[in-house]
Swiss-Prot record:
It is found in: Cytoplasm. It comes from Mycobacterium tuberculosis (strain ATCC 25618 / H37Rv). Its main location: cytoplasm. GO terms for molecular function: exodeoxyribonuclease VII activity; nucleic acid binding. The gene is xseA. One of its GO terms (biological process) is DNA catabolic process. Belongs to the XseA family. This is Exodeoxyribonuclease 7 large subunit. It is an enzyme of class 3 (hydrolase). Bidirectionally degrades single-stranded DNA into large acid-insoluble oligonucleotides, which are then degraded further into small acid-soluble oligonucleotides. One of its GO terms (cellular component) is exodeoxyribonuclease VII complex.
Length: 415
């Protein structure tokens, strides 16, 4: 093999031939997918189709003979899920890859349901069905986002019923394909667009009934994960009551039909008015009952003697007040007399113990007379010893009825 480098590059034909050789060595493969496009010209023997993987949004070009398409076990059309067997091939002229089919099989209903069940278990294990993740539906949505088929009965049912129940209801309608190969992509795009709109408070995903194949887009993994990622509450109204696509398990609220969805996202004006009227009647009745109870209570209070004649309480207690006053006066008189007598006794004892009584019995109090001199005067002192009154000391002698002046002649012998 020639060494390949920037200085020695391969020509396009060499690369194409090598790639075609590698791919040609591959054996036949079985592939499952959804038919997204079928090109079958009347005069052509080869049919060109596109096989799509909805979960990964990838596609593959396939070719087969016209007879193989006409003899297929199901009518091939866009959106049909099939299993094909083909040999990979690379066309060097256009540099394209495709599968040359040798067999086409339809995916049975049982197989579809089994795959949906496997996906259901996977999403459930990841917590996408957890009731704690369900967002509450607003009581009065400012605007209702509606994703449905163009001019469909589902769109008519939702808008008509919701407007009849709440005339002020507003809608942001996104018409999309609700079956076929383009359904999932368009629904997811519309869902994300409405989720980004700040005016949209709730999103309704509506579609009428159909076969299992028709409802396959609503059990698609991509759509289920897109619903779980929404910040806006999502309501599903897909099919009829028995239908149960996987999106019903992910949404915040499931409605049995589009009409049921309209009833669940907006209140009924008439019912709300009846409720308000009933509340007003009950409030008025409660107020009347309260006023009646209070009036009876006031009447009972007014009928009591104490309120009929307020002086009754004073009259009943007047005699007690008079007795209390008499008792208080008597007790005060006795208390004053007892205290007066006690004070008299104390005064007599004080008089007996005082100096005046002693003087009256013939005793005298002798004091030295205050002396003045150059160094200051001396205070008069009670004479307690003969030594305190030497000769010449001036004395003051106090007796019971007055005082006398005297002069000490000094100490004398004897008493």
């Amino acid at each position: 093999m020639t060494q390949n480098s920037a200085e020695n590059p391969f020509p396009v034909r060499a690369v194409a031939i090598r790639v075609a050789g590698w791919i040609d060595k591959l054996g036949a493969v079985w592939v499952e997918g959804q038919l997204a496009q079928i090109t079958m010209r009347p005069d052509a023997k080869t049919v060109f189709m596109v096989l799509r993987d909805p979960a990964a949004d990838m596609s593959l070009t396939v070719t087969c003979s016209r007879d193989l398409v006409l003899s297929a076990p199901v009518k091939l059309a866009e959106g049909v899920q099939v299993v094909v067997c083909g040999k990979p091939s690379f066309y060097t002229g256009r540099g394209t890859f495709s599968l040359r089919l040798s067999e086409i099989r339809a995916v049975g209903i049982g197989e579809l349901l089994a795959r949906i069940d496997r996906l259901r278990r996977l999403l459930d294990a990841e917590g996408l069905f957890d009731p704690r993740l369900k967002r509450p539906i607003p009581y009065l949505p400012n605007m209702i986002g509606l994703i449905t088929g163009r001019a469909s009965a589902a769109e008519r049912d939702v808008t008509t019923v919701a407007s009849a129940r709440w005339p002020a209801a507003r809608f942001a309608v996104r018409n999309v394909a609700v079956q076929g190969p383009n359904a999932v992509g368009q629904i997811v795009e519309a869902l994300r667009e409405l989720d980004r709109d700040p005016d949209v408070d709730v999103i309704v995903l509506a579609r009428g009934g159909g076969s299992v194949e028709d409802l396959l887009p609503f059990s698609d993994e991509t759509l289920c994960r897109a619903i779980a990622a929404c910040r806006t509450p999502v309501v599903s109204a897909v099919g009829h009551e028995p239908d149960n696509p996987l999106c019903d398990l992910v949404v915040d609220l499931r409605a049995a039909t589009p009409t049921d969805a309209a009833k669940k996202v907006v209140p009924d004006t008439a019912a709300e008015q009846r409720l308000i009227d009933d509340l007003r009647r009950r409030s008025a009745q409660a107020l009347r009952n309260w006023v009646s109870r209070e009036q009876r209570a006031v009447a009972q209070l007014r009928s009591r003697p104490v309120l009929a004649d307020p002086m009754t309480m004073v009259s009943v207690r007047a005699e007690e007040v008079h007795r209390a006053r008499s008792t208080l006066r008597r007790n005060l008189t006795l208390m004053v007399a007892a205290e007066t007598e006690r004070i008299g006794h104390l005064a007599a004892r004080l008089a007996t113990l005082g100096p005046a009584a002693t003087l009256a019995r013939g005793y005298a109090i002798v004091q030295t007379v205050a002396q003045t001199g150059p160094e200051g005067g001396s205070e008069p002192q009670v004479l307690r010893s003969v030594h305190d009154a030497p000769e010449g000391t001036k004395l003051r002698v106090r007796v019971a009825d007055g005082a006398l002046a005297a002069v000490s002649e000094g100490q004398t012998n004897g008493l």
